[in-house]
């Protein structure tokens, strides 16, 4: 499940995320028994989704299409590239089960996330007693060609620490480790 950063499991038929546009379901070709095994061999394996879909919207033979549509405006969202925290093996990301990235933690806290917004460790679903954020992992680092500050991570970590305390059923100790706290917006220093 890419949207939940691989923390949740996805069924063969899924909606990418709750506010997806268009508000439509898709079939994961790798999980669908017909798409992954039956179609190539010409066998009618499973296809239970066709029977269950009252609207008759499932067409396993549909091919990709390229459409030209008239629109009133275009939103350009160039995106960003997430730093691969496993490159810095001394933090344990990818080796220690309880180490997650901020984006993964964001999905853990989300009501539409894999644990329904409950603050739990992904590997054992138990509530943590202590949480630490390590700032500037990969940024402000010439070695990884990211010698700049992202400009958002400090406020992001503060927000996550506050929300973690709100979502926890028991007191949780939160700590943010940083080189220097950068809060670039008006009145952000108050946090």
Please give the residue ranges for each predicted region.
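Residues forming the flavin
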Residues: 1-191
């Amino acid at each position: 499940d890419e949207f939940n950063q691989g923390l949740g499991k996805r069924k063969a038929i899924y909606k990418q995320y709750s506010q997806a546009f268009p508000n439509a379901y898709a079939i994961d070709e790798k999980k669908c028994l017909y798409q992954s095994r039956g179609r190539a061999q010409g066998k009618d394996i499973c296809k239970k989704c066709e029977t269950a879909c009252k609207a008759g919207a499932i067409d396993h033979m549909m091919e990709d299409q390229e459409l030209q549509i008239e629109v009133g405006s275009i939103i350009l969202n160039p995106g960003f590239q997430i730093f691969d925290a496993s490159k810095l093996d001394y933090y344990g990301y990818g080796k220690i089960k309880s180490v997650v990235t901020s984006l993964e933690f964001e999905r853990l806290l989300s009501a539409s996330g894999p644990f329904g917004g409950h603050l739990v460790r992904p590997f054992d679903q138990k509530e943590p007693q202590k949480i630490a954020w390590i700032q500037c992992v990969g940024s402000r680092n010439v070695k990884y060609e990211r010698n700049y500050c992202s400009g958002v991570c400090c406020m992001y970590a503060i927000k996550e620490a506050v929300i973690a305390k709100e979502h926890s059923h028991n007191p949780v100790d939160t700590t943010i480790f940083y080189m220097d706290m950068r809060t670039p917006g008006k009145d952000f220093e108050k946090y």
